[in-house]
Amino acid sequence: MTHTLKTSLAIFLSLLLAVPTFAQHSHGMGSLQLNLNGDVLQGQWTMPMEALLGFEHLPKTAAQTDAMNQLQKSLQNASYFIELPVEAKCQQLEVKAESDMFQGIKGKGHSDLNYAFKYKCANPQALTKFGFPFFKSHIRSNQLKLEWVSQGAQKAATVRSSKPSFSP
């Protein structure tokens, strides 16, 4: 291997190792991968339950149980999490909300929400701005590390609760 190639490989590997992963658990911070493939928009959102409920253990009080049940109910409609332009004429196809807490499983200190959603959009070209209304209801949620992928375009951004929108 030439010296230049070895040096390039070493730099690439050091940069790769220095970049934090999207899977890290940090209170108040979540991650979102958005993918537009033709007329189908899919998303995968991960957020610490502490940022959504104020706790990340199995509920200990009636109020905590009610809060967790209300979150589960709210997540049945993806518009609780993400707001799409009306002009895109999107129809929700699927949502899936998973957490050890929802299943009554005692975690090992940290608990996350893993949320997947899918829309079919009649006018996907109108998907020019996304809002994140969940920030209003969950003040412990501070930011989302977002990755956007569509045909011929990729973008990464940080969406903050102070400016809860993203334009690809």
Which residues are covered by each model-predicted region?
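N-terminal soluble domains immediately following signal/targeting peptides that reside
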Residues: Q24-P168
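Sec/Tat signal peptide C-region and signal peptidase I cleavage site
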Residues: V19-A23
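N-terminal secretory signal peptides that target proteins for export/translocation
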Residues: M1-L5
